[in-house]
Amino acid sequence: MDSKVNSYGLIFSVLLIKFKMSKKPLILVTNDDGITAPGIRALISVMNELGDVIVVAPDSPQSAMGHAITINSTLHCDSIKIDEGPQIEYSCSGTPADCIKMGVNEILKRKPDICVSGVNHGSNSSINVIYSGTMSAALEASIEGIPAIGFSLLDYRWNADFDVIKPFIKKITKAAIKEGIPKGNALNVNFPKLKESEIKGIKICRQAKAHWVEKFDKRKSPFV
């Protein structure tokens, strides 16, 4: 796995040293919908309230990539700035699992206190966990010994409303930082698409048993 990390030079070096010396929790943020997706932008805004934030996320959508990693091509990782805020952001040409590997092994100067992935546009319950790039990123962080959480909202729209779930994201992440997550485990948090008044609370449950009904749209190629 070759990698190339392009930075803005001294300013990013200074910021990384600052993070190394900071007493705030160091939070690694990623997703599978791409670094510009509204879900990850909402997640970043919440994480900025809890600690020092480093974002390493795919430069394009990587949904349903599972735990794939890049082997036969070069990974490119570029410093960018999507929104205002104290967070440091990198876009990566690879998969969500690649982003974790790059963040932990190449970009960060110390192991993050927690990794959060999402917020995914759509559910990651049941068998979706196997296909999910969002959860695979969280699991990759867990393999690295980092407490990790994957967040998903049952709303596939690009303009989904994430404001309702922000307080719950903050509460869950804050608790995970304080109390920890058992080693080798990752949390899979799924939010229903509800109004704030309809949300009754947080419930811990087993992974559901379900499967997709496979349907294929068959077409005849005009070039055959």
Please report, for each region that a protein language model flagged, where it lies by residue:
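Short, Lys/Arg-enriched N-terminal segments with co-localized hydrophobic residues
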Residues: L10-K20
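A cross-family phosphate/adenosyl-ligand binding-site feature
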Residues: S22-K23, I27-T30, P38-E106, R110-K111
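Glycine-rich phosphate/pyrophosphate-binding loops
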Residues: S142-V164
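Glycine/threonine-rich flexible loop motifs
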Residues: S123-S132
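Alpha-helix C-terminal capping segments
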Residues: G103-K109, S136-P147
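Electrostatically charged, flexible surface regions
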Residues: D163-V224
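Short, Asp-centered acidic motifs that coordinate Mg2+ and/or phosphate
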Residues: I114
